[in-house]
Amino acid sequence: GLEHAEFFRYGVMHRNTFVDAPHVLDATFGVPGTDVRLAGQITGTEGYMEAVATGLLAALNTYAEAIDAVPLSLPRTGALGALVAYATDPETVGYQPMHVNFGLVPPLDDGNRRSKRDRYQAYADRAHAELDAYLGSRSELFPSRA
């Protein structure tokens, strides 16, 4: 299929253009002093699911603002909460684009040694429990959970 292809240049990776999110965005992915929210690759969050998730979070926070509700601040123990914290924490140094990964999630503090599989399951169990409790406390945004 590529026998007649002409290559313009070899060895060039794609180039990401992204804002210095920790210094220009608030925790809702908003640009302070404006009505603008950003999401996806431009914020330095990489990946298709990360783009969808940050877009949904930006939309939910826009809705929260419209109904005069407190913005969502997801627990850092979950994938999206940890990614948002990394992307919007002004203390982040040398900001670079990032996928969701377990390195962003706070460690388990129970002192138990686990296999990788069991550790990841413990991360998931903790994240699910904290997210469920948090969303249950936000009935103004999620009335069906009340």
Where are these regions (language model features)?
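A glycine-rich dinucleotide-binding beta-alpha-beta segment and adjacent secondary-structure elements
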Residues: 1-45, 52-53, 72-90, 95-99, ...
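Short, well-ordered loop/turn and helix-capping segments at boundaries between secondary-structure elements
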Residues: 48, 61-68, 85, 89-93, ...
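Internal hydrophobic alpha-helix adjacent to the cofactor/substrate pocket in enzyme cavities
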Residues: 52-74
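Predominant activation on well-ordered alpha-helical scaffold segments within soluble catalytic domains
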Residues: 53-60, 84, 128-132
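C-terminal auxiliary extensions adjacent to catalytic cores
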Residues: 97-146
